[in-house]
Amino acid sequence: MALGFERLKGKGLELLNPFRYGPLGDRILMTNEVGEFVVLSEEEFEKVVEGELAWDHPRYLELDEKHFFRSDAVTQELAERYATKNRFLFSGPYLHIVIVTLRCNEVCVYCHASRRDLADNTVDMSPDMARKVVDTIFETPSPSVTIEFQGGEPLVNWPAVKEIIEYSVEKNRTAGKRLEFSLVSNLAMMTEEKLAFLMENNVQICTSIDGPKEIHDANRHLKGGSAHEVAEFWMKRIDEAYAARGLDPDLYHVEALLTVTRRTLSHPREVVDEYVRLGRKAIFLRPLNPFGFAVKTFKEIGYTAEEFMAFYTAALDYMLELNQKGVEILERTAAILLTKILTAYDPNYLDLRSPCGAGIGQVAYNFDGKVFTCDEGRMVYQMGDDAFQIGELPSSSYTDLMLSSPVKALAVASTLEANPLCVDCVYKPYCGVCPVYNYAEQGGIFGQLVSNTRCKIYHGTLDYLFGKIAEGNNEVLDFFRKWTIVRDRSMFFMHD
């Protein structure tokens, strides 16, 4: 239900603040604009609509506590909480993804980045362009700046990585921003010398682990060796380096991402077990996206939203089993959504906000100076379509980038209130759309969300999480609350 009540009739509606509702099994889920929720039986919901729910009924008290009933004081509190949830709208882009090269030493069956061979050094960012990118990044009004190195394999162009880090640290002595660096790498070109530099500059390191060695190496081919063995070796070595600095291993370690392919679907437990074996306490189960090589190989490695959800829910069920046995492991997407559901805090995950982060939360810089709304927009460009290019350095100013047509168009297309399906959805307070994904899969930035794979997956994930919450198992609810806890990793912010 949307903010109007024309679809419901009942004298109780005039007592209520705007809300949305939808089925949750044989019950009804109600949500309000700041993400508070109540699960009711159909009979209880009918009584709420008719204004016949007794004031001392447990559900009445819950609705009152969660600001569903209208009053001036409640309206003011809701306005303040809404402003807090949406404070990201006024900060400017904080995530700056820098593609220092398209070259890569691995060949992935799903490569979204359209990688190039190691011999092709025409796709490296020059030191001069690296400095121009940094100059542009520091024009953002955001008090926080995260510079994320991607590729290709960013370690292939180590000089550009070093130049960007050193020049950013130098500029920040006067800019005074909360500066953070992140490196997304397959780790196969890591050396002790590079690691020492990254540690000295407090760079977060993230890699890919697609599950057990057999699955990982089938997805990610490394000439002359095992991509999994190399990644595992350096994960352990980097974790040791953090520990040698006296850092808490629960906070400071190599993060890992997983891309699900068809061969992954029948191994949810094995995938989770591999992350536990590697000492990881979080796993990010990511579906394929319609970008890069994944488009060409989809018939071999792809699947339906329903097949992915069967895998995903089996993996989450197993994680909950492990947690009950004392093994700490969480799933990142679930943790992000649970933070939105169970807390007053919004984690500002750029893919799940309204409007999305394209241009106004993140910007992507290609090796050649071309600038894009986001990394996904840059991926579309590598497929031969420049629809999401917002400028080119050094000729485009920061103002030019922010006022470009793609930034404006994606802000409109990702505002959920502007989407006929999303505006009525009970999950609207927790969700977000990706116009670039819509464009790649369905040919338009608004998309046809009824048949949209991404929408089906997020809707299914929220169905699962709310279903578990509604079961009322206190042990599971405790695990879910723990998944929402974010501890400060201040060591990664040493340049402010």
Please describe what each predicted stretch is.
Residues 103, 107, 111-114, 428-431, ...:
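Cys/His-rich metal-chelating microdomains
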Residues 134-150, 450-495:
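Short Fe-S-cluster ligation motifs
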